[in-house]
């Protein structure tokens, strides 16, 4: 399996590849959020139904603006989300009209996060946008916690593995509905 630095992984992503990369807690699988073919490939690899939707992880809040509909959130709701970022908080936000259903699934919202993980920030900076993020595992199995676990599940299936360390989070991010403030999953 090709092992690459974040800057080199950007080329794989821009070419429509699916990559694995370390995040705050587990390895993730990711691709270009503007490439439906790549998103379909990721969903097939993971054996995940498109209806569930996916998470976008960004290096900064500005990268999320083409994907979320801020007009459906009030100043308090936006300020609350931004007060938690960068960090291990994923917010469910209204989706911008016209966004691919492969990202939002069967919902009128999308899960988004601004990462504090240096490697993911570097990757997002290199591709100039957020990256699709879902845990590196087949649907229903435990997420990969090491490069070896990624290789065992995805050798010959994904385009590359980003070299780096997992962050210090013991569990995946907390998920909060930005409109209601309801915690959907404790991290």
Curated annotation (Swiss-Prot):
Question: What's its catalytic activity?
Answer: L-threonine + hydrogencarbonate + ATP = L-threonylcarbamoyladenylate + diphosphate + H2O
Which InterPro entries does the UniProt entry name for this protein?
DHBP_synth_RibB-like_a/b_dom (IPR017945), Sua5-like_dom (IPR006070), TC-AMP_synthase (IPR023535), TC-AMP_synthase_SUA5 (IPR050156)
Q: SUPFAM superfamilies, alphabetically?
A: YrdC/RibB
EC number(s) stated in the UniProt entry for this protein: 2.7.7.87
Q: Name one GO biological process term.
A: regulation of translational fidelity
Q: Where is the signal peptide?
A: none
The residues forming a coiled coil are none
Q: Does the keyword Nucleotide-binding apply?
A: yes
Q: Name one Pfam family in it.
A: Sua5_yciO_yrdC
Query: Which Gene3D superfamilies does the UniProt record give?
Result: DHBP synthase (3.90.870.10)
Q: Which UniProt keywords apply?
A: ATP-binding, Cytoplasm, Nucleotide-binding, Nucleotidyltransferase, Transferase, tRNA processing
Principal localisation: cytoplasm
User: Residue limits of the YrdC-like domain?
Assistant: 3-187
The family line of this record is: Belongs to the SUA5 family. TsaC subfamily.
What does this chain do?
Answer: Required for the formation of a threonylcarbamoyl group on adenosine at position 37 (t(6)A37) in tRNAs that read codons beginning with adenine. Catalyzes the conversion of L-threonine, HCO(3)(-)/CO(2) and ATP to give threonylcarbamoyl-AMP (TC-AMP) as the acyladenylate intermediate, with the release of diphosphate.
Q: Which NCBIfam families does this chain map to?
A: L-threonylcarbamoyladenylate synthase
Q: What protein name applies here?
A: Threonylcarbamoyl-AMP synthase
Q: Which organism is the protein's source?
A: Shewanella pealeana (strain ATCC 700345 / ANG-SQ1)
Gene that specifies this protein: tsaC
């Amino acid at each position: 399996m090709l092992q690459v630095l974040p800057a080199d992984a950007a080329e794989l992503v821009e070419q429509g590849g699916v990559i694995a990369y370390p995040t705050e807690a587990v390895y993730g699988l990711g691709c270009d959020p503007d490439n439906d073919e790549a998103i379909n490939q990721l969903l097939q690899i993971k054996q995940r139904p498109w209806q569930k939707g996916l998470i976008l992880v960004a290096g900064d809040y500005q990268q999320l603006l083409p994907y979320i509909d801020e007009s459906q959130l009030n100043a308090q709701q936006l300020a609350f989300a931004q007060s938690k970022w960068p960090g291990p908080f994923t917010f469910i936000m209204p989706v911008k009209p016209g966004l691919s259903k492969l990202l939002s699934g069967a919902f009128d919202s999308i899960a988004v996060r601004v990462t504090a993980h240096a490697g993911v920030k570097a990757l997002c900076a290199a591709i100039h946008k957020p990256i699709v993020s879902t845990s590196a595992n087949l649907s229903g199995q435990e997420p990969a916690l090491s490069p070896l676990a990624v290789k065992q599940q995805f050798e010959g299936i994904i385009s590359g593995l980003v070299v780096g360390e997992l962050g210090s989070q013991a569990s995946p991010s907390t998920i909060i509905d930005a409109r209601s403030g309801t915690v959907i999953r404790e991290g």
